[in-house]
């Protein structure tokens, strides 16, 4: 039994395709949008269409941008000697919020994952290698601390070290405010590995 007209069912289906949106949330979003004034719905739809039509990947780092190169790559105040390697453009946004890093970025657009059928040629590693020249002093690998992220980090280290680049990995460990008793063995081991002198 259908509760809604086909157009509403279709909109619910489309919202449910978004990450983290289940059928109930998609239904709430649909009903919310349908109750908005027509002008606001048109503004929302136009913003989606415009973003999809104008946003592209930076030819240097692979970040989202509306001009090429992106604002980070074209900023003369950024440290051009350091590249932070991340999995996705959203990771750049996360790193930038911290305001501790002032270098360049490189987006892999994925990780090495044999289980998912992704090898080194399926992510932006060739582009990373081509960026390593005499100017690059350090490559910081900031992939996620999971099996795929670790495998990708190890592979990057293996291919870049012969090129003379210093390859480092961001530290992983106990979150601020976390209790040791709730930390798993792998997290605690990583925290010990990444310890610093105080």
Curated annotation (Swiss-Prot):
Toprim domain span: 81-175
A family per Pfam: RecR_ZnF
Record's keyword terms, sorted: DNA damage, DNA recombination, DNA repair, Metal-binding, Zinc, Zinc-finger
GO-annotated biological processes: DNA recombination; DNA repair
GO MF, one example: DNA binding
Zinc finger boundaries on the chain: C4-type: 58-73
Record-linked InterPro entries: DNA_Rcmb_RecR (IPR000093), Rcmb_RecR (IPR023627), Rcmb_RecR_Znf (IPR015967), TOPRIM_dom (IPR006171), TOPRIM_RecR (IPR034137)
Cited PANTHER family: RECOMBINATION PROTEIN RECR
NCBIfam families per the UniProt record, alphabetical: recR (TIGR00615)
Function of the molecule: May play a role in DNA repair. It seems to be involved in an RecBC-independent recombinational process of DNA repair. It may act with RecF and RecO.
Family statement drawn from the similarity comment of this UniProt entry: Belongs to the RecR family.
Protein name: Recombination protein RecR
Organism from which the protein derives: Clostridium tetani (strain Massachusetts / E88)
């Amino acid at each position: 039994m259908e509760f809604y007209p086909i157009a509403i069912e279709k909109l619910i289906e489309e919202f449910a395709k978004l990450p983290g949106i289940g059928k109930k949330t998609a239904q709430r979003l649909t009903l919310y949008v349908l109750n908005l004034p027509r002008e606001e719905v048109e503004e929302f739809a136009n913003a989606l269409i415009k973003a999809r039509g104008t946003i592209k990947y930076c030819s240097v780092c692979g970040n989202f941008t509306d001009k090429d190169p992106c604002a980070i790559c074209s900023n003369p105040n950024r440290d051009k000697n350091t590249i932070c390697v991340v999995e996705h453009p959203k990771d750049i946004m996360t790193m930038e919020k911290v305001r501790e890093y002032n270098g360049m970025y490189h987006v892999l657009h994925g990780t090495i994952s044999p289980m998912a059928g992704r090898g080194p040629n399926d992510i932006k590693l060739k582009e990373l290698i081509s960026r390593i020249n005499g100017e690059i002093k350090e490559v910081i690998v900031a992939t996620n601390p999971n099996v795929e992220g670790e495998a990708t980090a190890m592979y990057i280290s293996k291919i870049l070290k012969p090129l003379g680049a210093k390859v480092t990995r961001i530290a992983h460990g106990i979150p601020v405010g976390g209790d040791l008793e709730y930390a798993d063995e792998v997290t605690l081991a990583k925290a010990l590995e990444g310890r610093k002198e105080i």
